[in-house]
Amino acid sequence: CIRDRVHAIKQIANFKTNATLSELDVRDSLNKYLPLDIRILDAEKTDNRFHARLNAKGKHYRYTIDNGEVANVFERKYMTRLTQNYDIEAMKKAAKLFIGEHDFKSFCDNKRMKKSTIRTISDISINNSDGIITIDFYGNGFLYHMVRILTGTLLMVGTHELSCDDIPDIIEKKSRDAAGF
């Protein structure tokens, strides 16, 4: 299922404290209490007004799909396994249609969204190397489940369930039912 296997790499977070620990002590102290599959790599003092999510200069999401003839047993926890044949060139062509500023309401899973659904995607790259498909999304921000739905839509283009010609109509409809899984 495309909905599992979610991971964060080099995620930025922030918190406020009155503690007088060094950055190294903050890192080491937090790591003592975290499970082994979650690690603080670095800590630094910031301006009091800094907010990791609100001050982000951009966001990057990656979907990794194991599409090889034989499942990758070593990386399986970090990939979704899909065995269909995908037309990567069609997916790349469709991805170009998402670049720029658009109303991505069709790609949002929040029916009660009160804020603007207009977002800007600066780049989408799709690569297939040795049966591993990576889809990278870069933008100024993303809606609830937007990247997941965009990925599903691109995969449907890759299996020819949708065509590139469908993408402008899906964007225009502003309906979650119009987009991919």
What residue ranges belong to the model's regions?
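Active-site loops and adjacent core secondary-structure elements that bind or stabilize anionic groups
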Residues: 1
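Structured-RNA-binding interfaces characteristic of tRNA pseudouridine synthases
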Residues: 4-181
